[in-house]
From Swiss-Prot:
It comes from Arabidopsis thaliana (Mouse-ear cress). PANTHER family: PROTEIN NLP5 (PTHR32002:SF36), PROTEIN NLP8 (PTHR32002). Residues 56-83, 660-680 are annotated as: Disordered. It is found in: Nucleus. It comes from the Eukaryota. This is Protein NLP5. Residues 663-673 have a biased composition (Low complexity). The gene is NLP5. Its main location: nucleus.
Amino acid sequence: MENNSLPMDPAMDSSFMDGLLLEGCWLETTDASEFLNFSPSTSVAPFDPSSFMWSPTQDTSNSLSQMYGQDCPERSSLEDQNQGRDLSTFNRRWWIGPSGHHGFSVMERLVQAVTHIKDFTSERGSLIQLWVPVDRGGKRVLTTKEQPFSHDPMCQRLAHYREISENYQFSTEQEDSDSSSRDLVGLPGRVFLGKVPEWTPDVRFFKNEEYPRVQHAQDCDVRGTLAIPVFEQGSQICLGVIEVVMTTQMVKLSPDLESICRALQAVDLRSTEIPIPPSLKGPDFSYQAALPEIRNLLRCACETHKLPLAQTWVSCLKQSKTGCRHNDENYIHCVSTIDDACYVGDPTVREFHEACSEHHLLKGQGVVGEAFLTNGPCFSSDVSSYKKSEYPLSHHATMFGLHGTVAIRLRCIHTGSVDFVLEFFLPKNCRDIEEQRKMLNALSTIMAHVPRSLRTVTQKELEEEGDSMVSEVIEKGVTLPKIENTTEVHQSISTPQNVGLVFDGGTTEMGELGSEYGKGVSVNENNTFSSASGFNRVTEKKRTKAEKNITLDVLRQYFAGSLKDAAKSIGVCPTTLKRICRQHGIQRWPSRKIKKVGHSLQKIQRVIDSVEGVSGHHLPIGSFYASFPNLAASPEASSLQQQSKITTFLSYSHSPPAKSPGSSCSHSSSCSSETQVIKEDPTDKTRLVSRSFKETQTTHLSPSSQEDDFLRVKVSYEEEKIRFKMRNSHRLKDLLWEIAKRFSIEDVSRYDLKYLDEDNEWVLLRCDDDVEECVDVCRSFPGQTIKLLLQLSSSYLPERSSVSGCLS
């Protein structure tokens, strides 16, 4: 119809016109000003058109050229191609949409909707403009030129921004599926193509490729922006996009969104919020049984480590939740917060939590969305650096100063398939990579005490879940949208602000996850997180053939060393090696046990050496370790061999041979100050051993041994550290009292004390014997400094049967 115009015959049959305009059409005239010249006698619009501001019919490119002194460099390439051509032909074309509301056309109803929206937003300065699809240069583009708009006439900034917006047009054709092409379509184009609203508290947070008008927005000082798609009732065809631009930041979405939706409904139009499809109905509220424990877990994590916010996310389908970002295609992939299973530790971020509650995410978006696709923890050092398409709440995170975030997916054992994702935001001042690593290690202690009603998702479940999801979707006739993988994009980025990593959780139990999670994290030369085993995506991780072929004979070769060294030599991570050991019936890495025996032997040797007049050979401890790889793997056999060898060693250290009927290394034989071998009753011998040890320590110690009576101790508690010296004879009670006094802790019974052993593992101190073992282990360290760690006791954390939370 571009070359012909309709004859304006007053006698034309009205039924013919109704049929012609039923599906909508383009009209063209030589005088575009005639289009909007509604006559009070003929117009059926229930409003005064004089209250509207309309775009000028003449071409505005010349005025803009004069304004900037040159052609606007931000204009789209389609507009550049039309330079030199008479653009008035575009200004003379008008789209008449399908009629469906008491004889009003779609355009008339959109004009009415803009009027209503203007009334709702009259309290503050705002610009309301409509973007509609038009054909230009053989392509379909969105433009706001010659379209209805409204703004505060007293605000020149908005008037200027309106003139700038008229020179932009955005493609409505998605040529590629990558994220970069989606960014180039701009905010209106993304909303038109995605058919879901998009908003930001401040457009100045956009990158230039995401929002081409960002520089002009900064110059005009515009802030909050909301863009929503417009549909006919019962139709999935997007008619256009309404954009609301404000001069103030927009943190809360609900008031403005509800006003716009009501304005559209008043003229028989709608936005994207849809009822739950009947085939997908059926909420599963059984997950609520786990919420009290989750609440306590989040609260304790925030209070212990001063976290600003912790949230719980669940599928919208499980909650039967609706939202403005839902449509028929993405509903089964939409997740949202459980508002009564969140904890706000910092009141200044409460509005951010409310924004998270309003803004649902799709699986794959942000750290939370990625966690729903894996079975291991996901971490980002700075979520505020994500693009809006990768994490829709990135601008809100920037606004509230939130950066580091970690999320983990857990499954409720009572519900079977209901998954929770727990999201923890690190403190605002925790920006340094090393500080974030320490915080992750600290959080691992909390996660070690996760409620027993929750567990991690195994790799097998993850694979089966993917297959069943596809089958269910096909059966219900729902189209799967393309889910963005936000973390793979960051694997090639060297800047720490853009790191989005998936921790290798494997198929570990929750207890193991607590000890391994965050452990061994380091920062490489590119300032990105790494570890010896790497952070591979769990969804892509397969068990290697090498893991399946690691036999007991292979493990025996590494028994003399630490578990970490063995894992590195074999080529697996420590968690995997532990799992392999359990498959072979090895519940504890043997070198740990044998080293304990070795420390006891060394202790006996020191006692013997301190006794005057004692002659004899030293205990052959070196040969004891050398023979260890030949020990049997069976715990019973290992125990018998150790007892046999120890008995032989002790007998060899005395001049007169004697029987060795003892049952353990510490009680198998004894020595007195006269180096006599006692042959009396075993109970007397045990008593004599104890007395002999005390006598030799107090009376017969050499000067060097007396100097060693004091030990250097270094204690870490949260971010604080202290150093002091303690006597070798210190009991656990004395040690705790000394630490509590220095850290000003009133009730130290609520805390656990751990020491760092030779395997670089934290071992709990429960009694005086543990302290004695700790001293023996640490004597072999360079400098002989005992490193201790004070942490909140596990009894202070919520247990499965407790719903009252942390102790006061």
